């Protein structure tokens, strides 16, 4: 354990379990044994180049788990985060790892274990993207790839290794992966790893790591085996639980349009514009810059649209939102930052010009609170690169997203 928890975060199992039951029965969205909440990435004291990577990746506002989980991890505390996939767990521990690396030392300093090859490669991708401006070197050690290639890359030097337990243990056993400088150890989807029978390998790996190591455990559920791991590996962990949102996708017809390439999205949107203007609609993109770009493109083609994003001052945003709510403006282009703040009850069409960067945000963009349960239509523009995210969204919410029929106007 690289740091000690501040007073008040000491972990009492009985108290936690009792409080957890209250949370699950009650109205609270989350429970944490750590009280700091940071509502923006800028407030977290992160390195400038890490912030650049976070914003370039398309994040604007931290999710509930990121607001509570990034800072304790950055402080070197042991952290247990219990939340469903899609709540932003990956970016939480990636940010915590990237903040603490010594980039001048080209040795493995962080080891992340994941249950599947696909997830390990996905984490590698996120870690590399967020750490792009810091010059991070990341490698995924997974089964089904060349052992010799793994050895060559590890020999050349990396800052972070992400991998599946089998291949990582093999690399440690062969001494191709040297544990001496590893100071952070993360288990992602711990429950899934245990259910796949990786328990012994996880223990074997842990035995080979330095004694003073920071541990992060991320898991959707906490079965007894996972709790046992936290007891054996961790010291006074900070615990954070995030409940699923109470928004619902019920009554919302969800469709996709295959656009193959990014460049084709604009034409597709223009083809749909007449339909958009029949009703009130919101178009979501992933970055502030893209809001401005798309707004200019639409206006240059004589399409009337409003736009709002986080760079605008609050007063301007309020005026634009007032016009939108009153119905004097009918098509709004925006980012995830405002997804939760838009009173979308009167909006019957949402277009995801860009699919969200994490599944959680899909719900905030198109979901409705059950109290109102208004009907609606959501249209997702899907390039070849987006197909995996669309699959993840369907799996996460247990929904089927169908291809857009030609009579879309009749559905509104």
Swiss-Prot record:
Motif DEAD box: chain residues: 188-191
All copies of domain Helicase ATP-binding, residue ranges: 70-240
Residues that bear N-acetylalanine: 2
CDD domains per record: DEADc_EIF4A (cd17939), SF2_C_DEAD (cd18787)
The UniProt record lists the keyword Ribonucleoprotein: no
Catalytic reactions on record: ATP + H2O = ADP + phosphate + H(+)
Protein known as: Eukaryotic initiation factor 4A-2
């Amino acid at each position: 354990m690289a740091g000690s928890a501040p007073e008040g975060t000491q972990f009492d199992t009985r108290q936690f379990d009792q409080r957890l039951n209250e949370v699950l029965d009650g109205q609270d969205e989350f429970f944490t044994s750590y009280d700091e909440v940071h509502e923006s990435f800028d407030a977290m004291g992160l390195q400038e180049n890490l912030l650049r990577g976070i914003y370039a990746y398309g994040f604007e506002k931290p999710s509930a788990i990121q607001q509570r989980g990034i800072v304790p991890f950055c402080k070197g505390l042991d952290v247990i985060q219990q939340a469903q996939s899609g709540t932003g767990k990956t970016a939480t521990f990636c940010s915590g790892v990237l903040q603490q690396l010594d980039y001048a030392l080209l040795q493995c300093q962080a080891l992340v274990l994941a249950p599947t090859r696909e997830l390990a490669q996905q984490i590698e991708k996120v870690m590399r993207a967020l750490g792009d401006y810091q010059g991070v070197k990341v490698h995924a050690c997974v089964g089904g790839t060349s052992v010799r290639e793994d050895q060559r890359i590890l020999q050349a030097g990396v800052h972070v290794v992400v991998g599946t337990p089998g291949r990582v243990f093999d690399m440690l056993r062969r001494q191709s992966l040297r544990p001496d400088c590893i100071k952070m150890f993360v288990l992602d989807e711990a429950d899934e790893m245990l259910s796949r029978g990786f328990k012994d390998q996880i223990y074997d790996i842990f035995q080979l790591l330095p004694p003073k190591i920071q541990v992060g455990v991320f898991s959707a559920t906490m079965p007894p085996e996972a709790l046992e791991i936290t007891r054996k590996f961790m010291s006074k962990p900070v615990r954070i639980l995030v409940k699923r949102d109470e928004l619902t996708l019920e009554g919302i017809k969800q469709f996709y349009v295959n656009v193959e390439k990014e460049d084709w999205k604009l034409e597709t949107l223009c083809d749909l514009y007449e339909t958009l203007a029949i009703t009130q609609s919101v178009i979501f993109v992933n970055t502030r810059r893209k809001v401005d770009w798309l707004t200019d493109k639409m206006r240059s083609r004589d399409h009337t649209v409003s736009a709002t994003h986080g760079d605008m001052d609050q007063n301007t945003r309020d005026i634009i939102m007032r016009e939108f709510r009153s119905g004097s403006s009918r098509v709004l282009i925006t980012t995830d930052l405002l997804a939760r703040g838009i009173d979308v009850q009167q909006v019957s069409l949402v277009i995801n010009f860009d699919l969200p960067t994490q599944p959680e945000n899909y719900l905030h963009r198109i979901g409705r609170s059950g109290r109102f349960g208004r009907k609606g239509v959501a249209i997702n523009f899907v390039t070849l690169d987006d197909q995996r995210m669309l699959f993840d969204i369907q799996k996460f919410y247990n929904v089927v997203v169908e291809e857009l029929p030609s009579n879309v106007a009749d559905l509104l």
